[in-house]
């Protein structure tokens, strides 16, 4: 009971706060400009050389630049090459599937293949982005490009043409994404820290909407630590690159400001409930964090029945399949559209209320987005006007993708419709069908969100608390014969398990406040013992623990186990 009084269970924000929340206050127009230029520049070359058909194909590869935004230049090429290769692959397979669907003599129900392909993409992408804990927009563009490319087969596009022009868009993205490194090689991490300081100051000085400002500050803090880690400035809770030490010091100062003001306002971790994409930041910590475990480790840890990533995948697949079957039965001709709509709502495995709000965002944003598409369609865009429309939508979607979901969808909706070659089809039937599929997918996804695997979060919480205990025991055993610096991987894994356990109990508190009470006291004890162990390692990195120190660590872990 004392633990619950000292660390109260987080309260769910109001629906109004969820509807109007801006998740990030960071400046995004430079990245948005690169995203627009990645379509505009190669598209202009295609038009000038007489290849008007290539504009949509270039767009599939031009999304590559989005995945590199915010990444330090040390890791950006690898991230962009991986994303670009994935985009081109799913687009090429989509065109092959489309040629089979639209072959002469094949009827309406052959579109089921498009739905199955899009569902398979959504399943794989949904699991990967949650297991790896990717930042927004996650893998959404992979699903959108893969599903939409099926519809490109309605034209005379060949796989060879797609590969060439998509690769052109990818190369343009790589050049645009890496060009700033010539003038400002440490720009991404410097801007991440500057954004953090701005968010921390706004949180401290703000007189209203403190919950939203705290969430923005936490989001900026996570982005800053991640940038410093990817830039190899910090490792193992310490500075390893003295040239970047001033950035670490500024980040720590901002973190202290955020934590102190959060304690003064007694907000706790309530701001985590403002979004379905929770940041891996403990609101009470003021130390340099460890880096993330390897991708293989994160995927392996998520590959269990009741994990957040696995349950999210189940919800995505179930809602997508039902949407596809019902949509085709009603005569709709874009099953990929229904899958993408369901995926957008469920892709992060949201809690019940935030997920429902995301569905409302999808509905409101899509209606406005369809109206925007109608205006573009009315004026008969093609060639240069089509290129400008694609680039403008890409620019605006990138501006809002990490800020507000409803506004982002306003621009991603016409972008997806244009890429699916809907500009050449009759307007009224297209609008009716797309709005019908959106409504259908949101209703089905909402039902699945609330009804499927309702007890899984409880089982997952119990499992994660066991994992945290096991990770503490593993690290403690290693410290008997090793220095903390020689067991960095075990320290890193323990931090990951503590953050995972904390993240899960936040979700459980939002959806099932009665069930969370049985885990809360042990949650507090586990977090205290785990960080006590990690702080010892950070304080004494290069020597083995004494017998007295080991006894103190053992007492902390035993107390957590008994809680």
Residue ranges and their predicted role:
Residues 93-98, 151-159, 374-378, 425, ...:
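Hydrophobic alpha-helical transmembrane segments in multi-pass integral membrane proteins
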Residues 81-101, 356-374:
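Membrane-helix boundary elements
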Residues 302-392:
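Core alpha-helical transmembrane segments of integral membrane proteins
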Residues 1-44, 48, 52, 154-166, ...:
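Cytosolic regulatory and coupling regions of membrane transport/channel systems
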Residues 73-81, 159-161, 186-189, 353-361:
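Interfacial helix-loop-helix linkers and transmembrane-helix boundary segments
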Residues 7-17, 35-43, 47-73, 84-91, ...:
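Pore- and pathway-forming membrane helices of multi-pass small-molecule/ion transporters and channels
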Residues 25-34, 53-59, 107-117, 306-313, ...:
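Hydrophobic alpha-helical transmembrane segments
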Residues 94-108, 131-132, 379:
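Transmembrane alpha-helix boundary signature
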């Amino acid at each position: 009971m004392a633990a619950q009084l000292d660390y109260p269970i987080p309260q769910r924000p109001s629906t109004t706060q969820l509807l109007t929340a801006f998740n990030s206050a960071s400046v995004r127009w430079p990245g948005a400009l690169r995203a627009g230029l990645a379509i505009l520049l190669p598209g202009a070359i295609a038009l000038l050389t007489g290849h008007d058909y290539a504009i949509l194909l270039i767009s599939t590869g031009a999304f590559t630049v989005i995945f590199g935004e915010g990444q330090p230049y040390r890791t950006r090429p690898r991230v962009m090459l991986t994303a670009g290769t994935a985009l081109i692959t799913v687009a090429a397979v989509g065109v092959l599937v489309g040629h089979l669907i639209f072959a002469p003599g094949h009827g309406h129900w052959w579109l089921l293949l498009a739905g199955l392909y899009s569902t398979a993409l959504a399943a794989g992408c949904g699991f990967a982005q949650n297991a790896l804990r990717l930042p927004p927009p996650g893998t959404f563009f992979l699903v959108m490009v893969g599903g939409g490319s099926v519809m490109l087969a309605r034209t005379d596009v060949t796989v060879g043409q797609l590969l060439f022009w998509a690769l052109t868009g990818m190369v343009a993205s790589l050049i645009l994404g890496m060009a700033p490194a010539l003038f400002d090689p440490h720009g991404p991490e410097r801007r991440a820290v500057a954004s953090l300081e701005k968010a921390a100051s706004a949180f401290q000085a703000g007189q209203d909407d403190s919950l939203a400002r705290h969430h923005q500050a936490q989001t900026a803090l996570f982005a800053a630590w991640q940038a410093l880690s990817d830039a190899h400035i910090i490792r193992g809770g310490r500075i390893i690159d003295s040239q970047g030490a001033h950035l670490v010091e500024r980040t720590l100062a901002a973190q202290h400001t955020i934590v102190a003001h959060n304690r003064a306002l007694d907000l706790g971790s309530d701001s985590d409930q403002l979004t379905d994409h929770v940041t891996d930041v403990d609101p009470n910590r003021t130390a340099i964090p460890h880096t993330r475990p390897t991708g293989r480790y994160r995927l392996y840890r998520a590959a269990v029945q009741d994990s957040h990533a696995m349950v999210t995948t189940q919800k995505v697949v179930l809602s997508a399949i039902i949407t596809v079957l019902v949509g085709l039965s009603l005569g709709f001709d874009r099953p990929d559209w229904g899958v993408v709509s369901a995926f957008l709502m469920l892709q992060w495995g949201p809690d019940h209320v935030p997920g429902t709000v995301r569905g409302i965002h999808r509905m409101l944003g899509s209606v406005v987005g369809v109206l925007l598409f109608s205006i573009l369609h009315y004026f008969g865009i093609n060639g240069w006007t089509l290129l400008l429309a694609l680039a403008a939508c890409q620019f605006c979607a990138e501006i809002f993708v990490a800020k507000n979901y409803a506004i982002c969808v306003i621009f991603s909706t016409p972008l997806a419709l244009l890429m699916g070659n809907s500009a050449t089809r009759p307007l009224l039937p297209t609008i009716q069908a797309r709005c019908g599929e959106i409504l259908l997918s949101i209703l089905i996804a909402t039902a699945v969100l609330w009804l499927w695997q309702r007890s899984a979060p409880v089982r997952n919480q119990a499992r994660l608390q066991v994992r945290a205990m096991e990770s503490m025991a593993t690290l403690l055993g290693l410290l008997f014969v090793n220095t903390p610096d020689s067991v960095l991987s075990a320290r890193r894994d323990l931090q990951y398990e503590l953050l995972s356990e904390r993240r899960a109990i936040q979700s459980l508190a939002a959806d099932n406040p009665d069930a969370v009470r049985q885990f809360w006291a042990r949650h507090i004890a586990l977090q205290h013992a785990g960080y006590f162990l990690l702080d010892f390692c950070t304080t004494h990195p290069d020597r083995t623990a004494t017998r007295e120190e080991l006894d103190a660590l053992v007492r902390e872990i035993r107390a957590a186990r008994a809680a």
